[in-house]
């Protein structure tokens, strides 16, 4: 069934509840629906339609009150957008609801897509959207006592535009009390079989939480009866920043969403912007981008490998693997001039060409790693203690992964071989040969196994980049390539003015909406950007895998021991900046 046939089927089945298709720069349809039809439409797409859409990729909001260009769209004060994916069809669909600005109300779909729970809480927290049918509306990223909804257009983007913040003793006490655990508010049981349960704050300062992150546990001895993850301690307003930084200036911020993914975080953002601009990236720039992304994938997976071993009791591997990572960072630094956050990709290409001698550095790294991985196989993956701590622990199946929006290695560990680089090749990945590692139990061990095998596949991709690096330009010959090539400046005063404006203010990106999707180190990372024809984005939405993955703890943790929880958290491989943004 094509996208057109899908739209026609939904229109025929739901009649006036589906009242318009919006043109975008994406390869999937965007439909406007009536708010009261949200539950029925989502239920049909998940459970009833042939070849269903089992994965809710994202649910987000747009404050439309300051937007000038909404041609072909119904009147809306606040728009709710849900993004669904069907792996069987290899297709997506986005549904939008128009809500009033003064009292936006939609209908919950959390009973249909369980992972909608946190997305709905975020829409309430950031935009003030209420969802009929929810048990509660608690903030998720902002402090409990925060006043207002910061992503609304009437809220300032800079701290200097707000009144001075003063932490009085009374306010400190109130904020501290607001963070105290209320089992009833969290839906936590306090007794089981007549025995009182211990309520424990696990974090936010525990080493095992891998960041500032709290899980409220209900414990019967060492057994976890219930768990409620609590996030937001690391929130920095990354999406709000996207509304005040120019399209070009925002690139360094994308490195810091998943601060271990490096340039890989730049890819989906630039995909979306380049799609809006109609820019085709040159083949050499594409290949260099892929090579650096795969080096960063190895850097991340080595850190995961060593820290998971450390979480389960092995101290030596993490030190060996940091030595390997240092070799990789030498390559990255030689090429980009930076280590963890290069900010090196550009709209339409790269910041610079490859330096002299880059190939020898890459070849040395490729020759170094395979033997090291062989050593780690015996040191970690075949280690009996490691296997005892991970095999059969925190297992889930593919259906559970879909319910909670789990993608990447966490999904592939269940036996589902979905990888965006293979299923929907982007940025030149269609030119490379590699395998997609999968597991079969979906437990901690398989999640580690998949990532270890991915290191070898990334080495294989990098080798192909090294052996077949094309010649040619590193920037697209396009008026919106940023910064514009200097060669275009050195003609007359007019070309100099255009170069100055493009380099200082940044490009004016055409009106429209576009989405970029990549297989990042943790799973599906997605940027949805809205342009109103300005030098900044009207809306920048960031869908991160870690946010979805942590939500699943409430379902998967019960029945584990506290020691098992340590292994489970390590096997998720999340980064709190990726969660909180």
From Swiss-Prot:
Classification via InterPro entries:
NADH_DH_suCD, NADH_Q_OxRdtase_suD, NADH_quin_OxRdtase_su_C/D-like, NADH_UbQ_OxRdtase_30kDa_su, NADH_UbQ_OxRdtase_49kDa_CS, NDH1_su_D/H, NiFe-Hase_large
- Tell me the SUPFAM superfamilies matching this sequence: HydB/Nqo4-like, Nqo5-like
Subcellular locations according to the entry: Cell inner membrane
Q: List the disulfide bonds.
A: none
This protein's GO CC annotations: NADH dehydrogenase complex; plasma membrane
The enzyme's first-digit EC class, named in words, is: translocase
Q: What are the GO MF terms of this UniProt record?
A: NAD binding; NADH dehydrogenase (ubiquinone) activity; NADH:ubiquinone reductase (non-electrogenic) activity; quinone binding
Q: Where is this region: NADH dehydrogenase I subunit C?
A: 1-172
Q: Give the chief site where it resides.
A: membrane
Q: Which PROSITE patterns match?
A: COMPLEX1_49K (PS00535)
Reaction it catalyzes: a quinone + NADH + 5 H(+)(in) = a quinol + NAD(+) + 4 H(+)(out)
Q: How does it sit in the membrane?
A: Peripheral membrane protein
Keywords in alphabetical order: Cell inner membrane, Cell membrane, Membrane, Multifunctional enzyme, NAD, Quinone, Translocase, Transport, Ubiquinone
Enzyme Commission code(s) on record: 7.1.1.-
Region annotated NADH dehydrogenase I subunit D, chain positions: 196-581
The family this protein is said to belong to: In the N-terminal section; belongs to the complex I 30 kDa subunit family.
* The protein's assembly and partners: NDH-1 is composed of 13 different subunits. Subunits NuoB, CD, E, F, and G constitute the peripheral sector of the complex.
Q: In UniProt terms, what function does this protein have?
A: NDH-1 shuttles electrons from NADH, via FMN and iron-sulfur (Fe-S) centers, to quinones in the respiratory chain. The immediate electron acceptor for the enzyme in this species is believed to be ubiquinone. Couples the redox reaction to proton translocation (for every two electrons transferred, four hydrogen ions are translocated across the cytoplasmic membrane), and thus conserves the redox energy in a proton gradient.
Q: What is this protein called?
A: NADH-quinone oxidoreductase subunit C/D
Organism phylogeny:
Bacteria, Pseudomonadati, Pseudomonadota, Alphaproteobacteria, Hyphomicrobiales
Q: Which gene encodes it?
A: nuoC
